[in-house]
Amino acid sequence: MAEKDKWGVAHVYSSFNNTIITVTDITGAETITQWSGGKVVRSDRQESSPFAAMEAANRVADDIKEKGIAGLHIKVRASGGNGPRTPGPGAQATIRALARAGIKIGKIEDVTPIPHDGTGRPGGKRGRRV
């Protein structure tokens, strides 16, 4: 197989506090590069912004091009469990930035953990009373 045909997996964890992008090999065993919104912006409140996600995705794209990876399968994950099941604002910006950087995109998959009746949500029997 040619060196240009190498593929990896981008694990995008996008919460409402931060966006973390980890690129592994196709098996998921070896981490190739990892960037987060907190590494590319100065203030804490901007970590989850689409701009921070876009900057992190551009750094990821530069790193994987150096390593000879041509395409990525993307796994998007939200907080899940007892938390919100919708990805944060950085998820879509990450995918768009990776596509614009000239990286082939294979599958886009949602891997948010969903509870199968484990522990209950915070708030108690009658919910959060405001």
From Swiss-Prot:
InterPro entries recorded: Ribosomal_uS11, Ribosomal_uS11_archaeal, Ribosomal_uS11_CS, Ribosomal_uS11_sf
GO terms assigned for molecular function: rRNA binding; structural constituent of ribosome
UniProt xrefs under Pfam families: Ribosomal_S11
Annotated SUPFAM superfamilies: Translational machinery components (SSF53137)
Gene Ontology biological process terms in this record: translation
Source organism superkingdom: Archaea
Keyword S-adenosyl-L-methionine: no
One cellular component (GO) term of this entry: ribonucleoprotein complex
Keywords for the protein's UniProt record, in alphabetical order: Ribonucleoprotein, Ribosomal protein, RNA-binding, rRNA-binding
Region entry Disordered, spans: 109-130
Coiled-coil parts of chain: none
Biological function: Located on the platform of the 30S subunit.
Subunit structure: Part of the 30S ribosomal subunit.
Stored HAMAP family: Ribosomal_uS11 (MF_01310)
Family to which this protein belongs: Belongs to the universal ribosomal protein uS11 family.
Name recorded for this polypeptide: Small ribosomal subunit protein uS11
UniProt organism field: Methanosphaera stadtmanae (strain ATCC 43021 / DSM 3091 / JCM 11832 / MCB-3)
Primary gene name: rps11
